Amino acid sequence: MGHKVNPVGLRLGINRTWDSRWFAGADYASLLHDDLKLREHLLGRLSGAGVSKVLIERPAKKPRVTIYAARPGVVIGKKGQDIEVLKKELSSMAKADVSLNIVEIRKPEIDAALVAQNIAQQLERRVAFRRAMKRAVQSAMRLGAQGIRINCSGRLGGAEIARMEWYREGRVPLHTLRADIDFGVATAKTTYGTCGVKVWIFKGEIMAHDPMAQDRRAAEQAPQR
């Protein structure tokens, strides 16, 4: 079962928690659609900033958005101009005053979402897929990952028949619920069609039953801006 399901969803409530954190009654559907719009807007607008995830909280009807990015300077802009413009855009979309936080990702090489995005960008630039995968695996293992697996699928290298290629190094225990496994997906839009990239990164085991464990680990690595 661990090989079939999304490893993030499988571990929710064990060592992972949700990326949208709020409670709602009758307006649940509208708030969920607002979250989806905010995420889509941010990921599209900040494509050059290396955004890994967007955390949305709604304390007292005032949305609080936290952006986890590898290049926070791109988000903030010169003298904080860009972040103010972004805050106004989000406030008009959410129809409420939005507070915005930026958290820097110090080691993008072991962040699954960023690794997947990087490989997808290389595939779009016609870099050989095996070279891109091998380089990502070596970087992740060098920076402390205990295991990594990468899947690339589609018309790889412009082949007539689509196929799936994978590369793995170290341990990636998908069935072990206490395993801290980061998972990311990305799509490369090539001239031959789309290619899918999936990345699993094993960072160690979290022995305690702590849904906030991964967030706490990220907060220890980087100060908020």
UniProtKB/Swiss-Prot annotation:
Part of the 30S ribosomal subunit. Forms a tight complex with proteins S10 and S14. The lineage of its organism: Bacteria, Pseudomonadati, Pseudomonadota, Alphaproteobacteria, Acetobacterales. HAMAP family: Ribosomal_uS3_B. NCBIfam families: rpsC_bact. PROSITE patterns: KH_TYPE_2, RIBOSOMAL_S3. Binds the lower part of the 30S subunit head. Binds mRNA in the 70S ribosome, positioning it for translation. One of its GO terms (molecular function) is mRNA binding. One of its GO terms (cellular component) is cytosolic small ribosomal subunit. GO terms for biological process: translation. It comes from Acidiphilium cryptum (strain JF-5). Belongs to the universal ribosomal protein uS3 family. CDD domains: KH-II_30S_S3 (cd02412). The keyword Signal does not apply. It comes from the Bacteria. InterPro entries: KH_dom, KH_dom-like_a/b, KH_dom_type_2, KH_sf_prok-type, Ribosomal_S3_C_sf, Ribosomal_uS3_bac-typ, Ribosomal_uS3_C, Ribosomal_uS3_CS. Residues 38-106 form the KH type-2 domain. Keywords: Ribonucleoprotein, Ribosomal protein, RNA-binding, rRNA-binding. This is Small ribosomal subunit protein uS3.
